[in-house]
Amino acid sequence: MKRLLLSIVLSGLVSQAAFASADLAKAKNCMSCHAVGNKLIGPSYKDVAAKYAGDAGAEDRLTQKVLKGGSGAWGPVPMPANTQVSEAEARTLVKWVLSQK
């Protein structure tokens, strides 16, 4: 019974973290150009996760791309710098993006 209760509590915490990160992406206007499962202006989060799967340095590089912007990795439209996003928020967002399957 304790294991069942622990599983329920932990799954709730994981779900809350996932929803919190999706809410953060919406609040920081990431969803204006990106979506979880389909390409908009920028790549889908699932495509980003697939491209960087197994890349140990991806989290750090993508955190900097969120903060400073970038170009060339996904086509001709550059990603602008996101001055409204703190480094901690960028890291949270990147971890969430990389967790998409």
What are these regions (language model features)?
Residues 29-36, 93:
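The canonical Cys-X-X-Cys-His
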Residues 4-13:
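Sec-dependent N-terminal signal peptides
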Residues 14-20:
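Sec/Tat signal peptide C-region and signal peptidase I cleavage site
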Residues 41-50, 65-94:
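Axial heme c-ligation environment in periplasmic c-type cytochrome domains
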Residues 22-24:
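Immediate flanking context of iron-sulfur cluster ligation sites
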Residues 26, 35-65:
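Gly/Gly-Pro-rich "capping" loops immediately C-terminal to redox-active cysteine motifs
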